């Protein structure tokens, strides 16, 4: 930390180097085989926006894999859903607080220290994907299987109608046996942004699907779809939700 602070406080500030020069040096320091780790999901998007502003080449073609250490902390130590502050995680793990928070270098140091404490192999499998750069075509779309669910990230589409007409977006395939499944509850949406489905696998049981429709650049849209095997309780809750939406729509006709 002392070395980094000296570099930031003297050499780099005196030179007053531009972002693109510093970023090129940083990427050279990272080398060929590296992976970003951030506290939360937004940093890589902002980084790549700055890179584009300065006319730099993107980090790669398509979504960038990275570790969202905030998410990994929740998977390893809490309920997998809650998102805590960096200082909360530092306190929880009893990491010494010997440098100030809310500064770029010190927060990076604390994030690395939290990451060092995460040993859960399931958590470490859960890589995230920054979607500033989307898949260019059907072949480069993201398909990844984790310990208990699968994720798919589509290429961009001109509008939601085209997106929700695509066979791959709408497909429900068991991520364990790779069989195409018949939907027991077809895709439905409570709000036009999130879509849900329910399918049955003869070998593995009920599978819940969720599609999140997200905005891309140039007024385009893309899909992030997750599929997960679920139990009877979640099946009943999803069916009840669909019935509730159907009833509300009847009342508003």
Regions flagged by a language model, labelled:
Residues 15-253:
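DEDD superfamily 3′-5′ metal-dependent exonuclease/proofreading module
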Residues 1-9, 14:
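Single conserved hydrophobic/aromatic residue that forms the stacking wall/gate
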């Amino acid at each position: 930390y002392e070395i980094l602070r000296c570099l930031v406080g003297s050499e780099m500030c005196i030179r007053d180097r531009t972002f693109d020069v510093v970023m090129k040096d940083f990427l050279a320091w990272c080398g060929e085989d590296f992976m970003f780790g951030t506290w939360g999901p937004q940093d890589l998007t902002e980084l790549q926006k700055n890179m584009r502003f300065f006319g730099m080449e993107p980090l790669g073609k398509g979504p960038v894999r990275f570790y969202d250490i905030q998410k990994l902390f929740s998977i390893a130590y809490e309920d997998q859903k809650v998102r805590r502050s960096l200082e909360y995680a530092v306190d929880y793990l009893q990491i010494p607080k010997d440098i100030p928070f809310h500064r770029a270098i010190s927060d990076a140091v604390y994030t690395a220290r939290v990451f060092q404490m995460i040993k859960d192999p399931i958590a470490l499998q859960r890589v995230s994907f920054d979607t500033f750069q989307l898949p260019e075509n059907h072949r480069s779309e993201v398909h990844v299987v984790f310990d208990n669910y699968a994720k798919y990230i589509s290429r961009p589409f001109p509008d939601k109608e085209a997106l929700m007409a695509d066979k791959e977006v709408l497909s429900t395939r068991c991520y364990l046996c790779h069989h195409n499944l018949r939907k027991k509850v077809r895709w439905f949406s409570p709000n036009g942004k999130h879509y849900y489905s329910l399918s049955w696998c003869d070998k593995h049981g009920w599978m819940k699907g969720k599609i999140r429709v997200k905005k891309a650049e140039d007024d385009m849209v893309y899909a992030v779809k997750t599929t997960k095997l679920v139990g009877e309780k979640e099946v009943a809750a999803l069916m009840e939700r669909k019935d509730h939406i159907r009833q509300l729509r009847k009342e508003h006709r």
